[in-house]
Amino acid sequence: MKKHYPTFPFFLTLVLVGLIAACSPKIQQAPESKFNRVQNIPPDIEKWERDMLAFERQDKEKNPGKRPILFIGSSSIVGWKSLESDFPGKRLLNRGFGGSQTDEVHYYAFRILYPYKPKQVVIYVGDNDIAAGKSSETVYNDLKDLFDDIRYQLPKTKITYISIKPSPSRWHLMDEFTKTNERVKTYLESMGNASYVDVVKPMLMPNGKANPEYFLSDSLHMTPQGYSVWAEALRPHLKGRF
């Protein structure tokens, strides 16, 4: 029987494929998700079920569309009523729920985050964690777990974190806020396709104190002027042009 040997073009093709593979940029492997929803159930998590059901009703009433820029987190996200006017022309979706902490946001990510497959997720959470007595170390680790899980579940989604704000009513916690912010900033810079938005500096007066014009009478939640500061700080970090 006559043997058929590979032709020269065949070998040339193999060589070219090898060269292309060697020269192609390496994509960093996403860390495997270590979050176990069964073993990591936050206390009183059922109190948020009403919010989750409300989000599901909203999705049925109005299709959120494909790959939105998703905002998740605590009451500072919930209260951002000017979101669409601050970022016109963007497909935005707000899925914040007030009073939430990082582990609660992470627990509900399978309902408020992953189903939407956002092109970008903007996160504000951690404030309530520290106010509840958690250390900056604990909050940082919870945030890191959340970031890693997002990267594992949605490797192409940009992760953007808004720093913990300098609320006058929680000024005594600023050292812990600062420690958390600094560690989160460093971690996000190492991730790629992620960004950290500093809202502390623009919310301070020249004397280093929080500007009261940016906060409501409770000295915790923000005024429209406060949200304008946030919008200005966030705008350069959003995907797509304005």
Task: List each language-model region with its residue ranges.
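Cell-envelope and extracellular/periplasmic
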Residues: 96-98, 123-130, 134, 144, ...
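Conserved beta-strand elements of the Class I
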Residues: 70-72, 93
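Charged helix-capping and loop-helix junction motifs
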Residues: 137-144, 176-181
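Acidic/histidine-rich helix-loop elements
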Residues: 39-44, 92-104, 131, 219
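Extracellular glycan-modifying ectodomains
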Residues: 62-64, 111, 128, 144, ...
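Oxyanion-hole/transition-state-stabilizing segment in secreted/luminal serine hydrolases
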Residues: 77-91, 103-141, 160, 164-168
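Catalytic His-Asp segment of secreted/periplasmic serine-dependent ester chemistry enzymes
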Residues: 168-242
